[in-house]
Amino acid sequence: MKRLFTIVCLLLATLTLPAQYRRPPYGDLYESVTVAAMREDVRFLASAALEGRKAGSEGEREAARYVSSRLEEEGVDVLTGPQGEPFGIRQENGDTLSSHNVLAFIPGYDKSVADHYIVIGARLDNIGTYELTIDGEKVTRICYDANGNASGLAMLIQLASMLQRNKVLLRRSVIIAAFGASCMLGAGSWYFLNRSFSAVDKIDAMINLDMLGTASSGFYAWPSGNADLTQFLSNLSATLQPIVPQVVTREPCFSDHKAFYDKEIPSVFFTTGMYPEYNSEKDTESILEYDNMERELEYIYNFAVQLCCGPRPLFKLDEATAARLNGKMVVPYYECDVKPTFLGSTDPGVFLQKWVYAYLHYPAEAVRQGIHGRVLVDFLIDEKGNVKDAHVLKGVHPLLDEEAVKVVGASPRWKPGKVRGKPVISEVSLYVEFILERRKNR
């Protein structure tokens, strides 16, 4: 939507900001102001009232309104109004699901690059609720999603506040984004890049924040195989920082950075990775490590300033990623002229039914622990139809993740996809679902 780009250009010249009152937090008297603010934001975003913020739900809409008001309160210009920018998603049943993106803007000072942007985003939604059958009775559980991704949203608000207060340091401009319907294969970020923002060619880089609350088990940065971003991370980590991420070469999980990567925009994904309470009613505020989140925030802020002021990173692969792909282009499944086929069908559902679910074994220990959910598996189909490099983009638990990857990776040959009549390496992502039903003892 060109309107957003026009508003951004106008805001480069002026800033007028309303403010809102926010109730101060109680308790935790010795924690920092930043930690107290993140704690309060998480308490609201992960509250039972929002019912897990499922895409299209009233809980997601309320989360969008909350993030909008908090950004305004921190003095950041919100581009999309109090409700966020609406967009629709056509569902398989023909209905349209309505979601919202929240976009805000911080202007850069250097006129030569102020019309170039660093996008910093976090997903707004999660899976909402789920049902279990216990002793023959259906029971609804809320996935409160404190770590996934109230933690990223709380950090996004604080990061926006820090950048706004120190905007005199920023050569490039910054777009703050809370993406709706992210769990629907990144619908919000796709809409932003393909329908909403007209100056995509001037987005120099993207920073994605997702699941950042459990740093004691690891703090990671995935630069999407980009050599320049890897160097940026290395340079910053060589300086005195409160915490330093481990740079990883495998994508920790699926998130909104992928839409930017597909547009060949250099992207870095910050996360503390998967955790046992993921997508369950146990993902509550109590598992978050706020002191570590504050340390992560400081590092990510310094990285964002570095991106805003440094040379534009080029979209190029590092040696490890280039070696994995052997210099060959990877084409997303849906962009192939002739899509890959399994047993004569281009529908990935046939692969799931005829192969995956036919040979999938529910791990006994997972059954004992009551672990269930959907594992998002990504894999490549090479020019000969062989399945390679199967790995988890969005996991549930190591027991289920390992079984899903094992079955997908053992797939028989496909008929490869083609572009302009020639076989290509194609990339497929699909969910493998583990359904657990507890039956009444007889």
Model-found features: residue ranges?
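Bacterial Sec-dependent N-terminal signal peptides
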Residues: 1-22
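A non-catalytic alpha/beta surface segment that caps or lines the substrate-entry region
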Residues: 53-107
